[in-house]
Amino acid sequence: DPIASHSATIVTTPVFEQQMAWLAAHRYRVVPLREVVAATLGNAPPIEGPAVAITADDGWRSVYTQMFPVIRREHLPVTLFINPPMISAGSAYLTWEMIAEMRASGLVDIEAHTQTHPNFNTERARRTPEAYAAYLTQQIGGSREALQARFGVAADLLAWPFGIHDAQLEAAARQGGFVAAFALGSRAAEPGGDPFAIPRYQVYETDIGARFAAVAEGFPRGRGVVQASSSRPIPSSTPRKAAISP
C-alpha cells in the first residue's frame, strides 16, 4: 500500500518488537486499558509504575497479520478501537473472524472509535445544531450498540477520532453509555482526571533507542497510555508494519 509506506503513523514490526523489548528490559508492566480506566475513575488504587497500556486505532488488517503474533508471543494486553461498519469492508481492514480470534486469546479488547471516524469539527460546520446532535447519537452511541450486539458484552470505552472532543461530544458519549473516552495529549493518565479525555502518547517508527527511552521515561512516575498508530497492510517485500498506541 503506497499510502501506508509513506505514513508517519506507521510502526514496523521490528521497531514494535524493539519498543516492547525496551519496556520489558526496564521492568515496565503492560496493563489492560481497563485498569487505567478504573484508576482514573477512582474505582481502583492508582497503578504502581512503571506501567503502560497499549492501544491501536482504526482496525487495519495489519494489526492481525503483524501485531497480533507479537502480542500473543509476548502475552501483551492490547485494546483495539474500531469503526464497526469498516470491519470486513475490504482487504485493508480486519474481518470479524480475525477479531473473534484475537478476542478469544484473552489479550485483545475491542472498543469503539465511532462508526465512520468523522472529523467532528467539519461535521458540526455542515449541519444545523439539531442535525448535528442526531449525528452524534448515530456516530457515538451507534458504534457502541453495534459492538454490544456483535459480542454481547459492554463496549463502553471510546477513542475520539483525530483526538477531537469537547463538552458536547463528551456529553454525547455519556448519554451513549460510555464510561470513558481517550484522546491524545502526550501526557500520563492520572487518577481523578477527566474520564472522557484520557490522554495517550502516540508512538512513531522513529521512537527507538534513546528516543523511545526519552518518551517512556517522560511519563510522570512511569505511567502512560501508549497509542500504537494505525497501520495498513503493505507489500511483503517491505518491512512489516504494526502499530502501537500510547
Model-derived features with residue positions:
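N-terminal pre-catalytic segment of deacetylase/amide-hydrolase enzymes
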Residues: 1-52, 217-246
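Metal-dependent polysaccharide deacetylase catalytic core of the NodB/CE4 family, i.e.
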Residues: 1-7, 26-29, 45-52, 60-61, ...
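Catalytic-core region of carbohydrate-active enzymes that cleave or remodel glycosidic bonds
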Residues: 176-185
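Short, solvent-exposed turn/loop segments enriched in Gly/Ser/Thr/Pro and often Arg
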Residues: 34-40, 114-116, 159-164, 185-190
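A cross-kingdom marker for long, charged
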Residues: 185-215
